Amino acid sequence: MPLADVFSLLVLGQGKSGLDVARWALAHPERVNAVTVYGGGTSEPNDATRALEAAGASFVYGTEQVEGAYDVCVTCPGISEFSGFFKAGREHAAQIMGEPEFAYRLSTDNWIAITGTNGKTTTTSLTDYLLKAAGEASVAVGNIGEPPINEIDGRAHNEWFVAELSSYQIATTTELHPRVAVLLNITPDHLGWHKSHKNYALAKIKLFDNMVDDDLVVVDVEDAGIHEFDEYIYTPGRRICKVAFDEPEGEDAAFVRDGKMIVRLKGVETPVSYTHLRAHETDQYL
């Protein structure tokens, strides 16, 4: 469901991304006609929330019992989708989502989204660097630095966002559609938020849900944690680039042959020169 031209906004949580969403909304009264922030059960006023209140936002502190009706609810990533607070937001808003999903719906950029239990920040930095080196307008966002919402204004159509996304953030997406999505690895993590390892893994894999055959899913096929969930990854119409040290089958792959990295896209191989990389660095460059 697209965002309305004008909508009322509910924000759950007063962490950085939640306050940044509220700040963006207040700066865009042509889009957002009311901003309400529920800070959470232990929340209290602070300098940042007072400044937003002075600018026109309404804050409710010390409770997770939401009242009222809203067009859009944006939740902070620390609020589990299985929590009573999240449920309250969903019951009182026509749509609920996390900050990356909200920013995606407002942006005109191409997105590259990178997730995994380990290695996200390094891979995001490398990807952003390579795009810039190729002359593309790119910005790294998400867990690596600024929330995407802080970077969407003033950008030309079809520039690039390189987003480092956690399982929390992906779990609260529905329409996020990266042009490229990277899954580095899966090991058990954040079980308190997701309630099970399977939920955690499927939240990561949810990143691929809206991708089509002219997008590119990049997966480390030698990671045992990823391999456990192959049935959810290899679905019809999904184009997958298999990453491995040993050469994998398929038209799309990245691997090492005779000491050089090889990238194969749609059957066409391109050697990528590199020297003096340690094993873990090679993995991240792949």
Language-model region placement:
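Phosphate-binding loop of NTP-binding sites
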Residues: 2, 6, 67-68, 77-221, ...
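Short polybasic amphipathic segments
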Residues: 253-255, 259-266
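Conserved small/polar residues in nucleotide/adenosyl-binding loops
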Residues: 275-282
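Cationic, low-complexity basic patches in intrinsically disordered or flexible, solvent-exposed regions
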Residues: 285
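Cofactor-binding loop segments of dinucleotide-utilizing enzymes, especially the Rossmann-like FAD-
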Residues: 14, 40, 117, 143, ...
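Short, hydrophobic beta-strand segments that form beta-sheet elements in well-ordered domains
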Residues: 35-39, 217-220, 242-243
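A short, charged helix-loop
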Residues: 269-271
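N-terminal leader/targeting and accessory segments in enzymes
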Residues: 1-98, 102
